[in-house]
From Swiss-Prot:
UniProt protein name: Nuclear pore complex protein NUP93A
UniProt similarity note: Belongs to the nucleoporin interacting component (NIC) family.
GO cellular component: nuclear envelope; nuclear pore; nucleolus; plasmodesma
Protein source organism: Arabidopsis thaliana
Single GO MF annotation: structural constituent of nuclear pore
Protein's GO biological process: mRNA transport; protein transport
Length: 861
């Protein structure tokens, strides 16, 4: 209905407009226009847009006035609205069908989970990228630091004075880093200079001083304690950062000093390997004594030590602190009618032994009724350094069995655990020890307590733990058993994944695995310079000839193998000084490397076996030759003159005959390596003048050939060789002892030198264009007989010439032919000389002359 009315309205309007159009008279001023509906719509929109533009300023002014009235900056608002963010609506995220609460919550849950997963993925990727970048930067910094340290590890070390090569030069003071050579070097100033350099360079310096003193003492047959001196040198470096670490390098040096026996008397009646274990046990006892004193000082009131300073009083003060929660102790009890005090007999004996107070332990065992049966066993163990008789061990083992059976029936509180440990130590039974470790693993608070117990139990078993059996059929506990048990665990178990890096080598040293400990230290990464410590620990152990005793279980190396490993390490360390030009420190460490394969201290005095002495001499010659080949090496080892009396070589080869033999061999090696200058110098130093001249003639012959082929440096090379030859001949004149045979050889080589010198002058004349003079000199040469006035020579004459002379002949003949081509033949002598040359070549065809020489002869005719 409504549509019909609307249509009728539009019809009436159209009818009215048609009538108006008919009534309108045409005008020339306004021509008629006809538009359809689409055109009218477009024109109306255009008109409306013009109207809106006219109305906009008034509306904008009104809007700005309204915003200002509300305190809003219209310009700021307009700038902010230039950028806007389109956010999704709920209709975009959730479907229209999700109208119930359950479906809505399900959708929210799913969206939250997806968003959480996506955010977690982004966080993981970002964290991974950050971590990888951090690791990459750390690795790069470490690589850069290690590389720079490898380049400059010794660069800041003091350099020796290479000018002073007297016999005492090796014992002189070194100039500290950064100090002037004119300032006297005092220990205080050295420490000040060392304070500003890295720890590994400090160690290298102070240890190097000890090595020089060690070598000097061994050369002179004087006593020296290397481990103690290395430890003292390390102590001068100042405080070491040991926060959170149970073992530092000072502790390891103390252990090395203990196991080598430098701080105690020589142990008789036990093997060298067992003596090392006893030394390790004594080190742990000294450490426990320090622990007791620190505990007493930390708890002075509970210790109640008073004015007593005896060893037994210290042990009782320590027990007052340790057993403070158990009540009154027996040694403090004054009223027997009150509650019975705590019996500490076995505690006192155990801690006296643990601290090394043997006399006090025996006194308590004898004076107490409950331990009187144990007293004779303890006395025997102390007297024999743990090597009790089999009968005593069987008695102690039986007592252990009784206590363990009692514990099985009545509980573990039925016996004193310290009593069980003490009887187990006396028994030395492997079965008892393994049972204690299995059933009573919490007996030991620290690894030091555990290792002290194990070291106290071991027996000196030769050939392995299975070769000796006690009377009751129980096998004794041996050092091999201890090493095998400790080696079950990875190094990271001891070092807490690298947080305490020195614990593992400390455990290896305590269990007399000396070579594995050194090898582990030498490979320990970090800025502590532990590889330097490893080298000097090896020097200390080898000097005492004990390194071969500590190859460890599974590393059954011979004496030579163990010493060779250490020698290689010392040699490699010494070569670092060689690369930096410090020849003084190089020779000190090379001497130690050679002494290491020779058996340590015994090698210096010649008391090692024949094979070790041979190995030492071979390595010493090899290493000294290596120094000779370096720049200033000859001057350093031999001095300004002579064959080593004034240099460092005299330290190692006091016999002049051995020195001469070594230098002749070194000169031969130099010649094989092409180091002719050094070979000539060495031959001259030992008085082998003919050999030196022969080397010069060989080099001069090669230089003349190079010069003839146009080599630029040939002339300077030949001039230097001729000067060197003349210098040798001048020295030869004043040499005191020259044999007749040597004189003849020198004269022969001098003749060859003059012949080569003449050939060189002919080449120079030819280059300068003095062809006639060159031909005259050629005619004078022996063995060729090219003078036209002389008869032809036979082939045998040329064969008797020096090979160095023969080498120069082809180039010489080419020069002669060139000169002949440039000199006019006025009397036929030129043609005669050409014929002589052709005849010479024909009579020596077996020489295989160069093809171009034959061609040049053919062209000349």
């Amino acid at each position: 209905m409504a549509n019909d009315q609307e249509m009728s309205g539009w019809t009436d309007l159209l009818h009215s407009s048609s009538k108006l159009l008919e009534q309108a008279a045409p005008s020339s001023q306004f021509p008629p226009l006809q538009r359809n509906l689409d055109q009218l719509e477009a024109l109306s929109k255009k008109l409306k847009a013009k109207t809106l533009r006219n109305e906009a300023p008034s509306q904008s002014i009104a809007a700005t006035r309204l915003l200002a009235r509300e305190g809003i900056n219209a310009e700021q608002l307009a700038r902010d609205l230039k950028s806007f963010e389109l956010k999704t609506t709920f209709e975009d995220v959730f479907p229209a069908e999700a109208t119930s609460v359950e479906e809505y919550l399900q959708q929210v849950h799913e969206m939250a989970m997806v968003s959480a997963i996506q955010e977690a993925q982004k966080d993981n990727v970002r964290s991974f990228n950050d971590y990888m970048m951090k690791v990459l930067e750390e690795d790069w910094r470490k690589e850069k630091r290690d590389f720079l340290q490898s380049l400059s590890r010794i660069s800041m070390l003091p350099k020796t004075n290479m000018i002073d090569t007297s016999r005492e030069a090796h014992a002189g003071q070194l100039v500290p880093v950064g100090s002037s050579p004119r300032v006297s070097s005092t220990p205080g100033k050295e420490l000040v200079a060392l304070a500003n350099i890295p720890i590994h360079e400090k160690k290298a310096y102070v240890y190097g001083e000890v090595v020089k003193k060690l070598n000097t003492s061994r050369e002179r047959g004087m006593p020296f304690r290397p481990a103690m001196c290395f430890k003292d040198a390390y102590d001068t470096l100042g405080a070491e950062v040991t926060r959170g670490k149970s073992v530092n390098m000072q502790k390891i040096w103390q252990l090395v000093q203990a196991i080598t026996g430098e701080d105690s008397a020589v142990r008789q009646g036990v093997s060298k390997r067992m003596a090392l274990a006893i030394g390790a046990r004594h080190h742990l006892q000294h450490g426990h004594e320090k622990f007791i004193m620190d505990t007493i000082q930390t708890h002075p009131t509970q210790a109640a030590l008073g004015g007593s300073v005896g060893n037994l009083q210290r042990i009782r003060a320590f027990l007052r602190i340790r057993l403070r929660d158990y009540g009154v102790l027996d040694f403090d009890s004054t009223d027997a009618r009150r509650q019975p005090p705590v019996d500490t007999t076995w505690q006192q004996i155990y801690f006296c032994l643990r601290t090394g107070y043997y006399e006090e332990a025996r006194e308590i065992a004898r004076s107490t009724r409950s331990s009187q049966q144990f007293a004779p066993l303890l006395t025997e163990w102390i007297t024999t350094d743990g090597m009790v008789a089999a009968e005593s061990a069987a008695i102690a083992s039986e007592e252990c069995e009784k206590m363990l059976r009692m514990g099985d029936r009545l509980g573990r509180t039925a016996y004193d655990k310290k009593k069980l440990l003490l009887y187990t130590i006396i028994s030395g039974s492997r079965r008892q020890i393994e049972r204690i470790l299995r059933d009573l693993s919490t007996l030991f608070n620290t690894i030091e307590d555990f290792l002290w117990f194990k070291l106290s139990c071991i027996r000196d078993v030769t050939g392995g733990s299975s070769s000796v059996v006690l009377n009751d059929g129980l096998a004794p506990y041996s050092l091999d058993d201890l090493q095998a048990y400790l080696n079950k665990f990875e190094p990271s178990y001891y070092t807490k994944n690298g947080k305490d890096p020195l614990v593992y080598p400390y455990v290896l040293l305590l269990s007399v695995q000396l070579l594995p400990a050194i090898m582990h230290l030498s490979k320990e990464a970090g800025d502590g310079g532990y590889n330097i410590d490893a080298v000097h620990i090896a020097i200390s152990l080898v000097d005492h000839s004990v390194l071969s005793e500590g190859s460890g279980t599974g590393h059954k190396l011979s004496v030579m193998d163990s010493n060779a490993e250490a020698s290689s390490m010392i040699r490699q360390y010494g070569s670092m000084f060689l690369h930096h030009g410090d020849l003084q420190m190089t020779v000190e460490y090379y001497a130690q490397a050679a002494a290491t394969v020779g058996g340590g201290q015994l090698a210096w005095s010649g008391r090692s076996n024949v094979d070790q002495q041979r190995q030492r001499n071979l390595m010493l010659k090899q290493l000294l030759t290596e120094i000779l080949l370096r720049e200033r090496g000859i001057y350093f080892l031999l001095g300004a003159r002579g064959s080593g009396e004034e240099g460092q070589l005299g330290r190692f080869f006091p016999d002049s005959r051995l020195r001469q033999q070594f230098l002749v061999e070194a000169a031969h090696q130099c010649q094989e390596a092409g180091l002719y200058d050094k070979s000539i110098e060495l031959q001259k130093r030992v008085g082998a003048f003919s050999a030196a001249l022969e080397t010069i003639n060989k080099c001069l012959s090669e230089a003349i050939c190079s010069l003839a082929r146009g080599r630029l440096d040939g002339e300077s090379r030949t001039s230097g060789l001729i000067l060197a030859g003349n210098d040798i001949l001048e020295t030869y004149k004043y040499y005191p002892e020259v044999s007749l045979q040597e004189r003849e050889r020198v004269m022969e080589q001098e003749t060859i030198l003059r012949e080569l010198e003449a050939i060189l002058s002919i080449h120079k004349l030819g280059r300068l264009g003095n062809h006639l003079d060159a031909l005259r000199e050629i005619a004078k040469l022996p063995f060729l007989h090219l003078d036209p006035r002389m008869p032809d020579a036979t082939a045998d004459v040329f064969q008797s010439a020096s090979p160095y002379f023969q080498t120069c002949v082809p180039d010489l003949l080419k020069v002669a032919l060139t000169c002949l081509d440039n000199v006019p033949d006025t009397d036929g002598s030129i043609r005669a000389m050409r014929s002589k040359i052709a005849g010479f070549l024909a009579s020596n065809t077996h020489r295989n002359w160069p093809r171009d020489l034959y061609e040049k002869v053919a062209r000349s005719f």
